[in-house]
Amino acid sequence: DEIMTGFGRTGRLFAFEHAGILPDIVTMAKGLTSSYAPLGAVGMRQGIADHYEDRIFWGGLTHNAHPLCLAAADASIQVLLDEGMVDNAATLEAVAREELNRLQSDHPSVAAGRVIGLLGMVDLQKNTSGAPFGGYGDKGSPVMKAFKRRLLEEGLYTYVRWSNFMVCPPLCIDEGTLREGFARIGRALDVVDDAFEA
């Protein structure tokens, strides 16, 4: 499943390349068009594709081969490759990791952070035992809602859910802008630190 990880997000064209495998089936979507147009695709080994030559699968035809979406995919992938954005994500992974480590050392509310390429996730905690601010399926604790508001005030929009948030900057970002983004996250985390139970 390369829907979130495909097309450079992890510093390789596809995340499965990090494991040195060649999957039988690959699903992809968002990165195909850089989310400018709706498009999804399934890639598969020839033997699997051959199976469907005489056994047509009639699902997923709503936007089948839509010319606008296909043109957006072609242009997006060309820019991604021509402008070195996959390499940029790989290069900036070290900067993102350094900044995530800084957040963890500067903010007691940061339990852990992980990153591959420019795909990151940060786990927050309300005490040293690692208890989350909100559980799975929770509609959002007041602390996490306040954190999201602070991020927006800082000019950042990201996925904040339960007791986690994502760090997924654009693949064209430069080092200075990436570091500034982390500085803004750090300022927003002050709200979460205020609720930390020491």
Spans of model-derived segments:
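Conserved N-terminal phosphate-binding loop of PLP-dependent enzymes in the Aspartate aminotransferase
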Residues: 2-198
